[in-house]
Regions:
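Extended C-terminal subregions enriched in glycine
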Residues: 296-333
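N-terminal alpha-helical targeting/anchoring segments
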Residues: 1-132
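Conserved small/polar residues in nucleotide/adenosyl-binding loops
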Residues: 334-343
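Active-site loop/lid in soluble adenylation, ligation, and acyl-transfer enzymes
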Residues: 111-129, 136-268
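Short glycine/proline-enriched loop/turn "hinge" motifs that connect secondary-structure elements
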Residues: 275-281
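Hydrophobic alpha-helical segments, chiefly the membrane-spanning helices
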Residues: 346-352
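Short histidine-centered catalytic/ligand-binding loop motif
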Residues: 163-173, 288-300
């Protein structure tokens, strides 16, 4: 979330970033307006406190002069001012909550190298690794492979959960575990601490790591406890140190997390691909670094290097894409820059 001083002192920078993203400026102006209203309320509250303190000083003088009636009048005035202060503090806190809730929806300022584009067609190639494999036979699709080997049971999963869930079985289930272990060990060798996070988070923690206004639509909520099933391991790993001040000498803090994740995936996927690509429950491995802002760009490159080195170690052909402004998405407003690695999935039955 952008610091409030950015809105007060560098609003033009935020407006220019919105223009780059193709977003209207309305919410920026609203945040500035709400901030001014909050500051006005804060000023009024401070004035009431000063008036209360000044009045309270007269109580002793009135009692010393033996004027009990005047002392009581001042006491009543102080009590009345105390109630006004309490009411004003409630209004001030509410104004700050409304301002900050809207401020959370304002994207971070993009890195200068992020390409400008309306959608994914504006993404640019960053790097290509390896060569596309060629075969002397016609490769089978993922659908064919899982059916002939009975590695996935979709029908029985649908009986107990609905669509886009599956039972993973046999060697394919073992392969998934093996890949998780391989990736974790790969990063542990680079001094990343292995963490298994909770798969539920409360609302307060979630609001600290993403804009729930947009992301909440793809999440599973648990009533009446106000918990959410996590949509990515990144969220609990980032929230782990909420309300804490991390000593500078402890940074950067490198972590690798593995967890089950849950999303209400929507769209046309599910017919030709048997519903195994856009699913509601899946495993994610995330690498997270908590660091000082001035070190963040170098560490972004470290994260990208880890990712490409992992793909290289598996001998898989892939490309790295520099995500453009229009493809960042509203749930990616925390991103200042983003890269995606896209592997060559030989056996996938493509929908295009």
């Amino acid at each position: 979330m952008l610091d409030m001083n950015m809105f007060r002192e560098h609003a033009d920078v935020i407006r220019a970033d919105h223009t780059k993203r193709g977003l209207p400026h309305d919410n920026i102006e609203k945040v500035i307006e709400l901030d001014q209203a909050w500051r006005n309320l804060l000023h009024e509250t401070d004035q009431l406190r000063r008036a209360k303190n000044e009045a309270a000083r007269g109580i002793g003088a009135a009692k010393k002069a033996g004027d009990n009636e005047a002392a009581q009048a001042i006491l009543n005035q102080v009590a009345d001012l105390g109630q006004k202060i309490a009411d004003m503090e409630a209004k001030t806190n509410e104004a700050m909550t409304v301002r900050d809730r809207l401020r959370m929806s304002i994207p971070n300022i993009l890195h200068k190298d992020v390409p400008v584009g309306a959608d994914e067609s504006g993404n640019t190639a960053y790097a290509v690794h390896g060569t596309k494999p060629e075969f002397s036979f016609e490769p089978r699709t993922h659908n064919e492979l899982i059916e002939m080997n009975k590695w996935v049971d979709l029908k029985r999963a649908a009986k107990i959960t609905g669509s886009r869930f599956y039972f993973l079985k046999g060697d394919l289930a073992r392969l998934e575990f093996a890949l998780q272990q391989y990736a974790v060990d790969f990063l542990r060798q680079r001094d990343y601490t292995f963490v298994q996070p909770p798969v539920m988070m409360n609302r307060e923690a979630y609001e600290g790591v993403t804009d729930l206004g947009d992301f909440e639509t793809v999440m599973y909520g648990i009533e009446p406890d106000k918990y959410y099933m996590i949509a990515t391991s990144e969220h609990p790993l980032t929230a782990m140190y909420m309300d804490e001040t991390i000593p500078e000498e402890q940074m950067p803090m490198r972590m690798v997390g593995v967890s089950q994740c849950f999303r209400r995936e929507v769209g046309s996927h599910g017919q030709s691909d048997l519903g195994i690509w856009r699913v509601h429950q899946f495993t994610k491995i995330e690498q997270i670094i908590i660091a000082k802002p001035e070190d963040s760009w170098a560490l972004h490159e470290e994260l990208l290097q880890n990712c490409t080195d992992l793909w290289d170690s598996l001998g898989i052909h892939y490309e790295v894409v520099n995500i453009c402004t229009g493809d960042m998405g509203t749930v990616s407003y925390t991103h200042l820059r983003a890269h995606e690695t896209k592997a060559n999935l030989v056996c996938r039955l493509l929908l295009e």
